[in-house]
Amino acid sequence: MELERIVGSALLTFVQAHLPEADLSGLDEVIFSYVLGVLEDLGPSGPSEENFDMEAFTEMMEAYVPGFAHIPRGIIGDMMQKLSVQLSDARNKENLHPQSSCVQGQVPIFPETPRQAEKLEEESRPPAAPGNTLDEAAAAEELPGVDVLLEVFPTCSMEQAQWVLAKARGDLEEAVHMLVEGKEEGPPGWDGPSQDLPRRLRGPQKDDLKSFILQKYMMVDRAEDQKTHRPMAPKEAPKKLIRYIDNQVVSTKGERFKDVRNPEAEEMKATYINLKPARKYRFH
């Protein structure tokens, strides 16, 4: 979380310096994790032309921060190089442990005192790069309202104050209002200026992380939720019309009738006379 906070502060300062009118709402923990993963893959040597795909990185950042592709590639490379140095220093501080006087197979003669441990830590701490100090000074000059926020909210850190002020686009009153009312989630690991702030301002807990991600990034069809499902009543089947009765064609309107003929005897058939004249055949 400390590394992501460093990445977030550096990106906000960089974008605010080169794109003052840019929309910073797309900068969240997702893009911070992406940049941190890219720097971890590059290793301690930092980005170079051989191992760093500048076009892919610029395309990804352009999707989250419109206008990022217009920043010169050399400036982006310098920013990534400085950020890699800052992350290396932070990792060295995290991995730094007091060296024990106990050697394998030997018993320590006397334990180290706390002052000796502090002195050892100060001696093995790498000297701060001059570029980092200049970057911090430039960030403080670019965001003059940070000092005011730190005075109003003593528990708020420098990165948190820069984050909220950048989201408010330099408007100090809006930044204070966002902190007081709890309208800003803050950078990763944000604990809020006080314990009385809403929970969403302090960031999600480990148990609520899954529900927090789903709530923030899941597609919700709100129009469908507002609709009331009213299924249509089934239509009555139309009246089945009878067309045939006893193999006899009848009306298609549904009347049930048929042509009933009384059988005639052979004697009556013999009395019938065919009035049709016989066909005349002419032979040529």
Curated annotation (Swiss-Prot):
Residues 141-184 form the CUE domain. InterPro entries: CUE, CUE_CUED2. This is CUE domain-containing protein 2. It comes from Mus musculus. The CUE domain mediates interaction with PGR and ESR1. Its main location: cytoplasm. It is found in: Cytoplasm; Nucleus. Residues 183-204 are annotated as: Disordered. Controls PGR and ESR1 protein levels through their targeting for ubiquitination and subsequent proteasomal degradation. Transmembrane segments: none annotated. Interacts with PGR and ESR1. One of its GO terms (biological process) is negative regulation of cytokine production involved in inflammatory response. Belongs to the CUEDC2 family. Keywords: Cytoplasm, Nucleus, Ubl conjugation pathway. GO terms for molecular function: ubiquitin binding. One of its GO terms (cellular component) is nucleoplasm.
